[in-house]
């Protein structure tokens, strides 16, 4: 496995490679990331993974505790990626990605990036889209792999490549869950044992809605919100039923008769967790 820390080294490493699959990450890797690599490995001659904690997608452009406290464990991440079968790792620092300071020209995500997660984290998806566009330009992948846990991110990136005619196929990969049902996330490392137990109310509420839909029962969305809002140690950010492609909220009156996605975010202590489930 080759590790490149500069753009030139990355471009040199990619010379003469055939089909390329890209797995963009911010590090602090877990089994969910390994599933992305597995999917990429099955469809491409060469698999590239990036590790970069992107300040543009954090509050105050990284001048915040969330950015400073984001887990960084490069040696462990490299070991996981090598075992998973990655060929090239791109692990730049901030100066390498944004030489001379933050960029003047950004990718702006419009309405799809300002609702739900974007409403709570202004500018977040502009930062995501900007760094992903840079990675696409550097790696020139045939396919790129993103976890379905970040459903809004997947929708934003799909619009990015469609609207800017970037020739890359976006491959969402299903959510990986721990045995207790919690969606795998790098942020889970910041939960205490008690906080992790409190966080389980999120997948429980989502799976409850899915069971009601499967049984042909009416969905009580406000009841689901109330359950999360009143759970011990939990603060509700949002829970909505949306169109899977556009993320536009769906108005339902009783039974749901069309494909839909429930997206939700909560805080457990200082840790923000997101999850979603298909209905």
From Swiss-Prot:
Cellular component annotations (GO), alphabetically ordered: cytosol
Residues at which ATP binds: 26-33, 147-150, 176, 184-187
Domain of life: Bacteria
Record localization: Cytoplasm
Ligand binding (beta-alanine): 57
UniProt pathway annotation: Cofactor biosynthesis; (R)-pantothenate biosynthesis; (R)-pantothenate from (R)-pantoate and beta-alanine: step 1/1
Enzyme Commission (EC) number: 6.3.2.1
Active-site residues per Swiss-Prot or TrEMBL entry: 33
Gene Ontology biological-process annotations: pantothenate biosynthetic process
A Pfam family hit: Pantoate_ligase
Binding residue positions for (R)-pantoate: 57, 153
Keywords per UniProt: ATP-binding, Cytoplasm, Ligase, Nucleotide-binding, Pantothenate biosynthesis
Function of the protein: Catalyzes the condensation of pantoate with beta-alanine in an ATP-dependent reaction via a pantoyl-adenylate intermediate.
Subunit annotation: Homodimer.
Family named by the database record: Belongs to the pantothenate synthetase family.
PANTHER family (alphabetical): CYTIDYLATE KINASE/PANTOATE-BETA-ALANINE LIGASE (PTHR21299), PANTOATE--BETA-ALANINE LIGASE (PTHR21299:SF1)
Miscellaneous: The reaction proceeds by a bi uni uni bi ping pong mechanism.
The protein's name in its UniProt record: Pantothenate synthetase
Organism: Corynebacterium glutamicum (strain R)
Gene that this sequence comes from: panC
């Amino acid at each position: 496995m080759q590790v490149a820390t500069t753009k030139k080294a990355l471009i040199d490493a990619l010379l003469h490679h055939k089909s390329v699959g890209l797995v963009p990450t911010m590090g602090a890797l877990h089994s969910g990331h390994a599933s992305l690599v597995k999917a990429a490995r099955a469809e491409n001659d060469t698999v590239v993974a990036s590790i970069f904690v992107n300040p543009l997608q954090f509050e105050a452009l990284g001048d915040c505790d969330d950015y400073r406290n984001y887990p960084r464990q490069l040696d462990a991440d490299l070991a996981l990626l090598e075992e998973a079968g990655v060929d090239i790792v791109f692990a730049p620092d901030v100066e390498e990605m944004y030489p001379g300071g933050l960029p003047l020209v950004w990718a702006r995500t419009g309405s799809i990036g300002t609702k739900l997660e974007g409403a709570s984290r202004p500018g977040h998806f502009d930062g995501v889209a900007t760094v992903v566009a840079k990675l696409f330009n550097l790696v020139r992948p045939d396919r790129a792999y993103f976890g379905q846990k970040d459903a809004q991110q997947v929708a934003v990136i799909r619009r990015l490549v469609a609207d800017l005619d970037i020739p890359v196929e976006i491959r969402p990969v299903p959510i990986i869950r721990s045995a207790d049902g919690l969606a795998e996330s790098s942020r889970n490392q910041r939960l205490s044992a008690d906080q992790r137990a409190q966080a389980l109310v999120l997948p429980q509420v989502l799976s409850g809605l899915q069971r009601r839909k499967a049984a042909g029962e009416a969905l009580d969305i406000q009841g689901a919100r109330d359950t999360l809002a009143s759970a011990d140690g939990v603060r509700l950010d949002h829970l909505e039923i949306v169109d899977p492609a556009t993320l536009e909220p769906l108005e339902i009156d009783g039974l749901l008769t069309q494909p839909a996605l429930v997206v939700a975010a909560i805080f457990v202590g200082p840790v923000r967790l997101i999850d979603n489930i298909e209905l």
